[in-house]
Design a protein with these regions (language model features):
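Active-site bordering "gate/hinge" segments
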Residues: 1-308, 313-316, 322-325, 361, ...
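Dual-mode signal for accessory low-complexity, basic/Gly-rich regions
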Residues: 281-400
Length: 400
């Protein structure tokens, strides 16, 4: 099934089109982004049951205008027909005169007008089980059953925590040549356990995610056996001797490396600021010929899947590294204009009141052809790394 449209967007769209026409009387380019979203997070642990609103939920609008030299933005949370002139005047009188407030010795960087190809569509992602139809009570019951089943696997396990979070968001983007709507739902599931090892407490977790609905609860149950195995392995583990070893990375560790150690380094707004080493290595080998790296909302069906970004650029599948050679970075529209290149559909806002930055979407290495068992057999002594819990980017040095 497809995620349905937002009734609020349908209601507000005629008014927003009037606002766009009003802005275009003054500016050669204007765009409007409307976001309407909802979502919840469910957590079950020894401490109890928690149901909270998803932290990414928002409702709001942002207009962007071009005065022939630079861009300005104005965010607001409500609009009806009698507020159109007020918003237009606010943009004219308080947003676009921003350059006059700069110190005399500070120059304004001139930007061209954003290319505005014609696109008119409404697209939706697929799902099997709608969270609202399943209901809070049943979701909690299912999460509780996963927790109880995991706890029953081994009496040494002292805690199992299960969690599930979803978001359904709708976005409308309007410009002189664009009228695009997207309806997207993503879901994440997590199961975490604790087991004692002497006076220590060891932790392991597993997770699943996707562009879809509460069918993810079925996936969570399949994570119980590997989680219990990890916990038992940790309970009998010994500290390693510090040194250099051959290692094989589980997909979650590989994902952390591709995201932190390299992904942030090819966000091209950092090229504009000369804060990224990657700019100097375009066209050169930066990895093994076995490595091909992608980023893009259209590159996979996952939690960062969408049809257009927050600047109205269509979703893409960007090949960043092709058989070891660094081909390109990822870019928002503003940084692309500064660099004289094309945006890649990576302009993302934390919320409507924040500017769009270059940010990753679905970032990953292409799978190889070797079997894990053969890879392990090829190493005389080493370690299999899994359960990455955190990382830190280093665009200027490519450190890990």
């Amino acid at each position: 099934m497809k995620v349905t449209s937002s009734k609020l967007i349908e209601q507000k769209k005629p008014v927003l089109k009037q606002l766009l026409d009003r802005l275009l009387q003054t500016y050669s380019y204007a765009s409007i982004l409307m976001t309407d979203s909802k979502g919840k997070q469910y957590t079950i642990s020894k401490q109890g049951i928690s149901i909270t609103e998803n932290m990414f939920v928002e409702l709001g609008y942002v207009v962007k205008v071009y005065d022939g030299e630079s861009y300005g933005e104005y965010a607001f949370s409500h609009i009806d027909e009698n507020e159109i002139d007020t918003i237009a005047e606010e943009v004219k009188n308080h947003v676009m005169p921003w350059a006059k407030k700069l110190p005399d010795d500070m120059k304004v960087k001139q930007y061209p007008e954003i290319p505005d190809e014609a696109y008119h569509f409404e697209k939706s992602t697929d799902y099997e089980v709608l969270p609202e139809e399943l209901g809070d009570e049943e979701i909690v019951k299912r999460l509780g059953a996963v927790r109880e089943k995991a706890m029953a696997q081994d009496e040494k396990i002292v805690e199992i925590k299960t969690a599930c979070v979803y978001q359904i968001y709708h976005k409308l983007f309007l410009s002189p040549n664009k009228d695009m709507t997207q309806n997207v739902m993503w879901t994440n599931g997590m199961i975490m356990g604790l087991i004692p090892k002497g006076e220590e407490m060891k932790m392991a977790f597993d997770s699943c995610s996707g562009c879809g609905g509460m069918e993810i609860l079925d996936d969570m149950e399949t994570k119980i056996p590997p989680l219990v195995q990890k916990l038992n392995d940790l309970a009998t583990s010994e500290p390693i001797t510090p040194g250099e070893y051959d290692c094989i990375c589980a997909p979650d560790v590989t994902g952390m490396i591709v995201h932190e150690a390299f992904g942030h380094g090819v966000e091209m707004d950092m090229f504009v600021k000369k804060r990224a080493l990657a700019e100097k290595y375009i066209g050169e080998y930066v990895a093994s010929p076995l490595v091909t790296m992608h980023d893009g909302a259209a590159a996979a069906s996952e939690t960062a899947t969408f049809f257009f970004d927050d600047e109205g650029t269509l979703a893409q599948d960007t090949v960043i590294i092709d058989k070891g050679i660094l081909k390109t970075g990822i870019c928002d529209a503003q940084a692309a204009m500064a660099l004289g290149t094309k945006p890649t559909g990576n302009g993302r806002r934390e919320k409507n009141s924040h500017k769009a930055y270059t940010r990753m979407t679905n970032t990953f290495f292409e799978p190889g052809t070797d079997k894990v068992e053969d890879m392990i057999a090829s190493i005389s002594y080493g370690f299999y790394l899994e359960n990455a819990s955190s990382g830190m980017e280093d665009p200027k040095n490519w450190g890990i």
